UniProtKB/Swiss-Prot annotation:
NCBIfam families: rpsS_bact (TIGR01050)
Entry keyword Ribonucleoprotein: yes
Molecular function terms from GO: rRNA binding; structural constituent of ribosome
Organism, scientific name: Staphylococcus epidermidis (strain ATCC 35984 / DSM 28319 / BCRC 17069 / CCUG 31568 / BM 3577 / RP62A)
Keywords, alphabetical: Ribonucleoprotein, Ribosomal protein, RNA-binding, rRNA-binding
Protein name per its UniProtKB record: Small ribosomal subunit protein uS19
Protein's job: Protein S19 forms a complex with S13 that binds strongly to the 16S ribosomal RNA.
GO-annotated biological processes: ribosomal small subunit assembly; translation
One GO location term (cellular component): small ribosomal subunit
Family: Belongs to the universal ribosomal protein uS19 family.
Keyword set includes rRNA-binding: yes
InterPro entries: Ribosomal_uS19 (IPR002222), Ribosomal_uS19_bac-type (IPR005732), Ribosomal_uS19_CS (IPR020934), Ribosomal_uS19_SF (IPR023575)
Length: 92
């Protein structure tokens, strides 16, 4: 279910402050965050976020196509190892 339009998009305040602080400086560093729920704003473009996936921080470089999505969409939490191999082929 989508968020109500009257509420507007959500972004954590501490994350927005970190982005605004880096916009003023020349050197851009990786911004480490646990806020997977934050919406990507247009002023995030060009920044790299280290988004926590429950195990480690995954680097996510924000491009123009990502605006409006959540940070957590680009850091998957589950790793799929594949289904078990079929033993019928090895028995022949």
């Amino acid at each position: 279910m989508a968020r109500s339009i009257k509420k507007g998009p959500f972004v954590d305040d501490h994350l927005m402050k970190k982005v605004e602080a880096q916009d003023g400086s020349e050197k851009k560093q990786v911004i480490k965050t646990w806020s997977r729920r934050s919406t990507i704003f247009p002023n995030f473009i060009g920044h790299t976020f280290a988004v926590y996936d429950g195990r480690k921080h995954v680097p996510v470089y924000v491009t123009e196509d990502m605006v409006g999505h959540k940070l957590g969409e680009f850091a998957p939490t589950r790793t799929f190892k594949g289904h078990a191999a079929d033993d019928k082929k090895t028995r022949r």
